[in-house]
A protein has these predicted regions:
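The beta1-alpha1 cofactor-binding region of Rossmann-like NAD(H)/NADP(H)-dependent oxidoreductases
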Residues: 123, 144-157, 188, 300
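A glycine/serine/threonine-rich, flexible loop-to-helix segment
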Residues: 233-235, 257, 268-292, 296, ...
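C-terminal substrate-recognition "lid" of short-chain dehydrogenase/reductases
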Residues: 212, 260, 298-325, 330
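Conserved mid-core segment of classical short-chain dehydrogenase/reductases
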Residues: 48-54, 154, 175-192, 211, ...
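Active-site helix of classical SDR
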Residues: 206, 240, 248
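Alpha-helical segment proximal to the catalytic Tyr-Lys
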Residues: 211, 253-257
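Catalytic Tyr-X3-Lys loop
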Residues: 168, 184-203, 220, 244, ...
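Residue(s) in the substrate-gating loop at a strand-loop-helix junction
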Residues: 224
Length: 331
């Protein structure tokens, strides 16, 4: 397990994201933006009880640390039994230190894959993820960097190939989100962060990975329900997620002649650091309450979808799919 600090200044990226966050918070202090309404009890469909709203008031500094969340996200999927679906494979996961990326890393390891995770700055979260991967009997590589930097992406891929002998699965999962009540509120800096991370980052990492991917390899992109239905306060973010869905389908058509499948998972609300680092303290208490399940998903409820799409034994004829995991037909 190693931490590789690259020349690109990730500290600057984090401070830029926090500046955008502070601007939003200041606007809402003056406008008095209210919180959402409550919910009834959630239906039970999971093998174990899952947390329901309301959750405690909380707000995280970007990019958000999983260790600070209350309740802690569930990512270990103890009811999931591995069966060597990814045995002998190497996977690279962006945004792999926490949230969905962490849960995917754990299940990939349980299925026999070695895992490299790329993350921005949360070293403690990344170490915990790697420790969980290693407990599954797999190897884990930690790589610090900003996916907006194409040189970082090339380096991350090369480090993965050097460490594990190849690259079989790429999961583009890193993202940036900051809400705005109108398009006029979105500054150039805000827009650059969103487009740079959510579109350029996906293209940068995929472009770097492709020369190392052979027939049978798989690329999985993290989309969003906002890319399917839009969101009134996530204008730029929704646009990037729609673009990711289109990129997924286009790459699937482009790469099938090389035997490389490309699919996406489109999650609904998921309890990760991502949203508490965006929403206000009061608003987050009811996060996920308006979904059909009346609660947010836990990361461990998303990760099996990524295993399914990555595994040739499960999804060899699935290509260009946008798999919605919404808790209902419209989230």
């Amino acid at each position: 397990m190693s931490i590789e600090h690259k020349s690109h200044d990730t500290h600057t990226t984090v401070e830029e994201q926090r500046d955008i966050q502070r601007e939003t918070e200041q606007r809402e202090k003056t406008s008095g933006d209210g919180k959402s309404s409550g919910s009834d009890g959630a239906p039970s469909t999971a093998p174990r009880p899952q947390p329901q709203p309301p959750v405690p008031e909380q707000h995280l500094r970007k990019p958000g640390s999983e260790s600070e969340l209350d309740p802690r996200p569930k990512f270990m999927a103890p009811d999931y039994k591995g069966s060597d679906k990814l045995k002998g494979m190497a996977a690279l996961i962006t945004g792999g230190d926490s949230g969905i990326g962490r849960a995917v890393a754990v299940l990939f390891a349980r299925e026999g894959a070695n895992v490299a995770i790329v993350y921005l700055c949360e070293d403690d979260d990344a170490r915990e993820t790697c420790a969980c991967v290693e407990k599954e009997g797999a190897r884990c590589l930690m790589i610090v960097g900003d996916v907006r930097d194409s040189a970082l992406c090339r380096s991350a891929v090369q480090q993965t190939v050097d460490a594990f002998g190849g690259l079989h699965v790429l999961v583009n999962n890193a993202g940036f989100q900051e809400h705005a009540t109108s398009l006029e509120e979105i500054t150039d800096e805000h827009l650059d962060q969103t487009l740079g991370t959510n579109i350029h980052g996906y293209i940068n990492m995929t472009r770097a990975a492709l020369p190392h991917m052979q027939s049978g390899a798989s690329i999985i992109n993290t989309g969003s329900e906002t890319g399917l239905f839009g969101h009134a306060k996530l204008l730029d973010y929704s646009a990037t997620k729609g673009a990711i869905h289109a990129l997924t389908k286009s790459l699937a058509s482009n790469l099938i002649s090389r035997g490389i499948r490309v699919n996406a998972v489109a999650p609904g609300p998921v309890w990760t650091p991502f949203n508490p680092a965006d929403k206000g303290r009061e608003e987050i208490t009811e996060f996920g309450a308006h979904s059909a399940m009346k609660r947010p998903a836990q990361p461990e409820e998303l990760s099996p979808a990524y295993v399914f799409l990555a595994a040739p034994s499960c999804a060899s004829y699935i290509n260009g799919a946008i798999l919605p995991v919404l808790g209902g037909p419209t989230g």
